[in-house]
UniProtKB/Swiss-Prot annotation:
Protein name from the UniProt record: UPF0306 protein YhbP
InterPro entries assigned to the protein according to its UniProt record, in alphabetical order: Split_barrel_FMN-bd, UPF0306
NCBIfam families: PRK03467.1
Family membership noted in the UniProt record: Belongs to the UPF0306 family.
Length: 147
Protein backbone atom coordinates (compact mmCIF):
# COMPACT_ATOMS: atom_id res chain seq x y z
CA UNK A 1 0.00 0.00 0.00
CA UNK A 2 1.44 3.40 -0.91
CA UNK A 3 1.84 6.23 1.60
CA UNK A 4 -1.10 8.36 0.42
CA UNK A 5 -3.44 5.36 0.41
CA UNK A 6 -2.48 4.50 4.01
CA UNK A 7 -2.93 8.11 5.13
CA UNK A 8 -6.19 8.47 3.21
CA UNK A 9 -7.71 5.33 4.72
CA UNK A 10 -7.00 6.62 8.19
CA UNK A 11 -8.27 10.16 7.45
CA UNK A 12 -11.50 8.73 6.01
CA UNK A 13 -12.20 7.02 9.36
CA UNK A 14 -11.78 10.21 11.40
CA UNK A 15 -14.11 13.21 11.48
CA UNK A 16 -12.64 16.17 13.43
CA UNK A 17 -9.93 18.48 12.10
CA UNK A 18 -8.12 21.28 13.93
CA UNK A 19 -6.68 23.97 11.69
CA UNK A 20 -4.86 27.23 12.32
CA UNK A 21 -4.73 30.44 10.32
CA UNK A 22 -2.51 33.50 10.53
CA UNK A 23 -3.48 37.05 9.61
CA UNK A 24 -1.70 40.32 10.38
CA UNK A 25 0.42 38.80 13.14
CA UNK A 26 -2.50 37.01 14.81
CA UNK A 27 -2.95 33.21 15.03
CA UNK A 28 -6.25 31.39 15.55
CA UNK A 29 -7.29 27.74 15.58
CA UNK A 30 -10.66 26.10 14.97
CA UNK A 31 -12.21 22.63 14.97
CA UNK A 32 -14.85 21.16 12.69
CA UNK A 33 -16.23 17.91 11.36
CA UNK A 34 -14.70 17.16 7.96
CA UNK A 35 -15.14 14.92 4.96
CA UNK A 36 -11.95 13.57 3.35
CA UNK A 37 -11.77 13.64 -0.46
CA UNK A 38 -9.14 11.06 -1.47
CA UNK A 39 -9.15 12.03 -5.15
CA UNK A 40 -8.33 15.70 -4.47
CA UNK A 41 -6.47 15.07 -1.19
CA UNK A 42 -8.65 17.63 0.54
CA UNK A 43 -10.86 18.08 3.57
CA UNK A 44 -14.31 19.68 3.26
CA UNK A 45 -15.93 21.40 6.21
CA UNK A 46 -18.66 23.90 7.05
CA UNK A 47 -17.96 27.12 8.92
CA UNK A 48 -19.77 30.43 9.03
CA UNK A 49 -18.27 33.49 7.35
CA UNK A 50 -18.69 35.45 10.60
CA UNK A 51 -16.31 33.24 12.60
CA UNK A 52 -12.94 34.63 13.56
CA UNK A 53 -11.06 31.96 11.59
CA UNK A 54 -13.15 32.49 8.44
CA UNK A 55 -12.65 36.25 8.56
CA UNK A 56 -8.91 35.76 9.05
CA UNK A 57 -8.83 33.32 6.11
CA UNK A 58 -10.66 35.54 3.66
CA UNK A 59 -11.40 33.76 0.38
CA UNK A 60 -8.12 31.78 0.52
CA UNK A 61 -5.25 31.44 3.02
CA UNK A 62 -2.35 29.21 4.06
CA UNK A 63 -3.30 26.79 6.83
CA UNK A 64 -1.75 24.19 9.11
CA UNK A 65 -3.45 21.68 11.33
CA UNK A 66 -3.93 18.25 12.81
CA UNK A 67 -6.25 15.28 12.85
CA UNK A 68 -5.79 12.83 15.70
CA UNK A 69 -7.55 10.05 17.53
CA UNK A 70 -7.80 9.70 21.30
CA UNK A 71 -5.98 6.45 22.12
CA UNK A 72 -5.49 5.35 25.69
CA UNK A 73 -1.95 4.00 25.13
CA UNK A 74 1.16 5.36 23.41
CA UNK A 75 1.43 2.30 21.17
CA UNK A 76 -1.94 3.16 19.56
CA UNK A 77 -1.15 6.83 18.76
CA UNK A 78 -2.00 7.81 15.21
CA UNK A 79 -2.32 11.33 13.88
CA UNK A 80 -1.76 13.70 11.01
CA UNK A 81 -0.01 17.04 10.88
CA UNK A 82 -0.56 18.99 7.68
CA UNK A 83 -0.11 22.23 5.83
CA UNK A 84 -2.06 23.45 2.86
CA UNK A 85 -4.52 26.10 1.71
CA UNK A 86 -8.04 26.79 2.93
CA UNK A 87 -10.55 28.38 0.59
CA UNK A 88 -14.27 29.05 0.51
CA UNK A 89 -15.95 27.07 -2.26
CA UNK A 90 -18.48 28.66 -4.61
CA UNK A 91 -21.01 27.54 -7.21
CA UNK A 92 -21.01 23.98 -8.53
CA UNK A 93 -17.85 23.13 -6.61
CA UNK A 94 -19.58 24.10 -3.36
CA UNK A 95 -22.79 22.26 -4.30
CA UNK A 96 -20.95 19.00 -5.03
CA UNK A 97 -18.88 19.18 -1.83
CA UNK A 98 -21.97 20.02 0.28
CA UNK A 99 -23.88 17.05 -1.17
CA UNK A 100 -21.03 14.68 -0.26
CA UNK A 101 -20.61 16.28 3.18
CA UNK A 102 -24.32 15.92 3.97
CA UNK A 103 -24.23 12.22 3.07
CA UNK A 104 -21.68 11.74 5.85
CA UNK A 105 -23.17 14.27 8.30
CA UNK A 106 -26.95 14.52 7.64
CA UNK A 107 -27.49 16.65 10.75
CA UNK A 108 -25.57 19.46 9.00
CA UNK A 109 -28.57 20.05 6.68
CA UNK A 110 -29.78 22.64 9.19
CA UNK A 111 -26.53 24.64 8.91
CA UNK A 112 -26.52 27.38 6.27
CA UNK A 113 -22.73 27.81 6.62
CA UNK A 114 -20.64 27.83 3.43
CA UNK A 115 -18.41 24.91 2.42
CA UNK A 116 -14.66 25.30 2.75
CA UNK A 117 -11.88 23.16 1.31
CA UNK A 118 -8.53 22.52 2.94
CA UNK A 119 -6.25 21.36 0.13
CA UNK A 120 -3.55 19.26 1.78
CA UNK A 121 -0.12 20.00 0.31
CA UNK A 122 2.05 18.27 2.92
CA UNK A 123 1.11 15.50 5.35
CA UNK A 124 3.06 13.80 8.13
CA UNK A 125 1.27 10.74 9.53
CA UNK A 126 2.51 9.34 12.83
CA UNK A 127 1.41 5.73 13.27
CA UNK A 128 2.74 4.00 16.37
CA UNK A 129 0.80 0.85 15.44
CA UNK A 130 3.55 0.30 12.83
CA UNK A 131 6.29 0.79 15.43
CA UNK A 132 7.01 3.48 17.99
CA UNK A 133 7.53 6.85 16.29
CA UNK A 134 6.82 5.54 12.76
CA UNK A 135 6.18 8.45 10.38
CA UNK A 136 4.84 8.49 6.83
CA UNK A 137 5.37 11.64 4.75
CA UNK A 138 3.47 12.82 1.68
CA UNK A 139 3.96 15.94 -0.48
CA UNK A 140 1.52 17.05 -3.17
CA UNK A 141 4.47 17.78 -5.51
CA UNK A 142 5.71 14.19 -5.14
CA UNK A 143 2.34 12.86 -6.33
CA UNK A 144 2.65 14.89 -9.51
CA UNK A 145 6.15 13.48 -10.08
CA UNK A 146 4.92 9.89 -9.60
CA UNK A 147 2.00 10.24 -12.04
Amino acid sequence: MDTLTAIGRWLAKQHVVTWCVHHEGELWCANAFYLFDAQNVALYLLTDDKTRHAQMSGACAPVAGTVNGQPKTVTRIRGVQFKGVIRRLEGQESDAARKAYLRRFPVARVLPAPVWEIRLDEIKFTDNTLGFGKKLHWLRDSRAQQA
